[in-house]
């Protein structure tokens, strides 16, 4: 059977996608599967690369814009093949948000992972919080802020945020991943700058209460029969980890299993399974939690296409 690995993409997480793709092609059991490389460039061009029958030794093989491994331009619809399945490894907007899933369903091509609605809701931090809060899964206090509302009445936004939350606050674009566009604010001036930064990536932002907490992650796998892994913990040398500390500076590592009480471990797995089920998850996802020193768990987010890079795989 052929796996069509779809990676790259137009989002700010293009490079993360290539790292994930390299991990996947090195994990495939080639006695049973072949891997067809299809890369979406930063400007949206689709390139068809090699058909892999064994694991590549170099990451450069996946960069289909490299002259040594130049891919052949194709139309998106040409990805459709019989006896094949697409594995989308497109992180962030235009990949993890339901757009590519909708396209694949339109052309009748089976794919790995969450469907359109789950992908769209899971990518949108505001929608995720609304749905999972209604399901009884604890969240840190937050305030959603739309760009138009901010432009029309910034003073009211400040009052709303400062009336509901305490500094420090974390400001995030609603539809980005890999900590892109996330800023910590200690005062009103920093809050203003942080919102402006978030609006570079999205017209909707979310302001969250900053808390002192450990960061716990649970991998989820399955469709109707849902399984969870033992929780892992992100151990970091920075106050909070942004894109650089995640992927460039090697300032974090994953400790598996997390050194937490059995009761907390079971609760994290229960919440992860419930979040996955309530959002209609399928294939795989990763649930991220905050854990306070009082052993309180708060859901941070659910990732429907988690990064799988070998150097620091956050899919425990």
From Swiss-Prot:
For binding ATP, which residues are annotated in this chain's numbering? 162-217
So which domain of life are we looking at?
A: Bacteria
Primary location group? cytoplasm
* InterPro entries per UniProt: ATP-grasp, ATP_grasp_subdomain_1, D-Ala_lig_Van_CS, D_ala_D_ala, Dala_Dala_lig_C, Dala_Dala_lig_N, PreATP-grasp_dom_sf
Q: Where is the signal peptide?
A: none
Identify one Gene Ontology CC term for this UniProt entry.
cytosol
**Gene Ontology biological process:** cell wall organization; peptidoglycan biosynthetic process; regulation of cell shape
| Enzyme Commission number(s) of this protein | 6.3.2.4
Q: Where does Mg(2+) 2 bind?
A: 301, 303
Domain ATP-grasp positions: 129-316
Question: Pathway listed for it?
Answer: Cell wall biogenesis; peptidoglycan biosynthesis
Gene Ontology MF term list: ATP binding; D-alanine-D-alanine ligase activity; metal ion binding
| Catalytic activity field | 2 D-alanine + ATP = D-alanyl-D-alanine + ADP + phosphate + H(+)
Keyword annotations: ATP-binding, Cell shape, Cell wall biogenesis/degradation, Cytoplasm, Ligase, Magnesium, Manganese, Metal-binding, Nucleotide-binding, Peptidoglycan synthesis
The protein's required cofactor(s) are namely: Mg(2+); Mn(2+)
Q: How is the cofactor bound?
A: Binds 2 magnesium or manganese ions per subunit.
Q: Where in the cell is it found?
A: Cytoplasm
- Which Pfam families does the entry mention? Dala_Dala_lig_C, Dala_Dala_lig_N
What broad class of enzyme is this? ligase
UniProt function note:
Cell wall formation.
Q: Give the UniProt family note.
A: Belongs to the D-alanine--D-alanine ligase family.
Q: What is this protein called?
A: D-alanine--D-alanine ligase
């Amino acid at each position: 059977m052929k796996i069509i690995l779809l990676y790259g993409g137009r989002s700010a997480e293009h490079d993360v996608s290539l790292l994930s793709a390299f991990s996947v092609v090195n994990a495939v059991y080639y006695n049973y599967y072949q891997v067809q490389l299809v890369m979406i460039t930063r400007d949206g061009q689709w390139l068809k690369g090699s058909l892999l029958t064994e694991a590549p030794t170099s990451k450069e093989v996946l960069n289909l814009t490299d002259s040594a491994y130049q891919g052949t331009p194709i139309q998106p619809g040409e990805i459709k093949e019989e006896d094949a399945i697409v594995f989308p490894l497109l992180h962030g907007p235009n990949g993890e948000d339901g757009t590519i899933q909708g396209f694949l369903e339109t052309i009748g091509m089976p794919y790995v992972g969450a469907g359109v609605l789950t992908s769209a809701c899971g990518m949108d931090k505001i929608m995720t919080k609304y749905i999972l809060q209604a399901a009884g899964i604890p969240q840190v206090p937050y305030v959603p802020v739309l760009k138009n509302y901010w432009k029309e009445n910034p003073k009211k936004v400040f009052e709303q945020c400062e009336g509901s939350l305490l500094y420090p606050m974390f400001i995030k674009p609603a539809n980005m991943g890999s900590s892109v566009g996330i800023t910590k604010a200690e005062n009103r001036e920093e809050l203003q700058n942080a919102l402006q930064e978030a609006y570079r990536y999205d017209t909707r932002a979310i302001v969250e209460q900053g808390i002192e907490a450990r960061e716990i992650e649970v991998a989820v796998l399955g469709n109707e029969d849902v399984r969870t892994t033992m929780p892992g913990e992100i151990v970091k040398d920075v106050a909070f980890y942004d894109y650089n500390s995640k992927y460039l500076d090697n300032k974090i590592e994953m400790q598996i299993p997390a050194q937490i009480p059995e009761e907390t471990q079971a609760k994290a797995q229960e919440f992860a399974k419930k979040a996955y089920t309530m959002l209609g998850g399928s294939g795989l996802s990763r649930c991220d939690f905050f854990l306070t020193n009082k052993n309180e768990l708060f859901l941070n987010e659910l990732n429907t296409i988690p990064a799988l890079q070998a150097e620091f795989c956050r899919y425990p």
